[in-house]
Amino acid sequence: HKDVMRGRRDRLGELWVPIGSSAMFDPQVLLDMAYNGMFVIQCYGATETCGAGIINFAQDEKHIGAVGQGSELMDYKIEPDGELCMRGDCVMMGYYKDPEGTAEVIDKDGWVHTGDLAWVDEDGYYYITGRKKNLIILDSGENVSPEELEGMLEKCPVVQECIVKELGKKIGVVVYCEKEHQ
């Protein structure tokens, strides 16, 4: 992204279709790449669904941060706690010789509980906000997604890397800055 924004897209060679999956990306980064001639694709899937899931080809500002719209091959729902669930013919039969593990992930109605937190907009685009198991539950009862906080912190130009973790019902942050700002 930095090379693209500094006008050095040529350093990326023939790369013109960056594909992102398995992580949340800053929508502004994706939009910057799209505005600079790249066709950005985001994908979402799971091993338990044989890779089938959601894909986003949208290049517009409103939807570029989404993982996409659902496929006709799958059913999707978001649980009251925000967890994304998927169901369809491509869902695995279960984990090999692990019925307990299978029961934790696939419910009696065939829904795969992904463990990912998401929301869907009025146009049917899904947005991943974090992992259910990573939620920090504060003393006030508020649920905080560390991934969302990390995304906000990483927008600061001097921040190279950061980690947000729970420290006794409070939010703990480790920030690594550029050397000259340490």
Q: Whereabouts are the PLM-identified features?
A:
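Gly/Ser/Thr-rich phosphate-binding loop
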Residues: H1-K62, Q160
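AMP-binding/adenylate-forming catalytic core of the ANL superfamily
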Residues: I78, G88, M93-G94, L117-Q182
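Short low-complexity, flexible loop/linker segments enriched in glycine and/or proline
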Residues: I55-Q59, G101, C177
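Conserved ANL (AMP-binding/adenylate-forming) active-site segment centered on the GW(Y/F)…HTG consensus within
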Residues: E61-I64, V91-G115, E147-G151
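Conserved ATP/PPi-binding loop(s) of AMP-dependent carboxylate-activating enzymes
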Residues: F39, Q69-E72, E79-V105, Y125, ...
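Generic, well-ordered alpha-helical scaffold segments in large soluble proteins
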Residues: D32, N36-F39, D98, V105, ...
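Active-site glycine-centered loops adjacent to acidic/histidine catalytic or metal-binding residues
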Residues: S22, G45, G68, D116, ...
